[in-house]
Amino acid sequence: MEETILTANALKFRYDPEQPTYALNGVSVGVRRGEFVAVLGANGCGKSTLAKHFNAILLPESGKVYVEAMDTADDSKLYDIRQTVGMVFQNPDNQIVATVVEEDVAFALENLGVPPQEMRRRVDESMKMAGIYEFRERAPHNLSGGQKQRVAIAGVVAMRPDCLILDEATAMLDPRGREQVMQTIHHLNKNMGITVVSITHYMEEAAQADRVIVMSKGHVVMEGTPKEVFSQTEKVRSLHLDVPQAAELREELVKAGIPLPEGIIDTGECAQALYELLK
């Protein structure tokens, strides 16, 4: 049985206890170690609220959240939880605190009292992993949005987390910046074994995940592999979400009488299916 690193059991949360509306209303989900999970949903669905529970930024009103069996409501476990789960937010400018890239990556390690030699090794490894080593002596404000976000990721990865949560970390980036960041994230997941939970509204990003969770009005309403979720195009659209462009193209071609198989969610699959029909 695969080990579960993040668990929410019957999680309920309101930002205002005086109001009847729950941001999370009975959410039960689990994330397995080494998995890449994308969490989707329209604005206000509760996806970012869920992400903040996995890092103990927010605590349940009722129900439980566990990080490697540590209860997030246990104050004595807070340090260990945040060592286990790192978080990268939407705006990279809000996460950068130093005037030189390598100093920013080292910032948290300095606060933890990591010995200088170990710190140097971790900082260099993290910058190389994130593809920013060549910028190590540059000022962060001179970097592009995608490069800044990779600086933020390197700073988190230097802490050696087992899990990385991205709270719409590519939302403010241009297409090239998004591509750079996602390449880095996939490298962390596939080559370093870091569990990834990506809160996103980009369907093409979600299509590359191992599993997709869809939320609506504080509930989990869909869950499965990208193929299982995005094959249900009508249901996905009813939740005010798009589907990957390849899935949309496949749908239109089928309507035009071209018999393409179900489950096509990326352009490579779509091109291969068309090639098989034409050869």
What do the PLM-derived regions correspond to, one by one?
Residues N55:
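Helix-to-loop junction immediately C-terminal to a conserved catalytic motif
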Residues Q117-F135:
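Conserved ABC ATPase "signature" region
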Residues L164-D167:
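Catalytic Walker B motif of ABC-type/P-loop ATPase nucleotide-binding domains
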Residues G63-A73, I81:
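Conserved ABC transporter NBD signature motif
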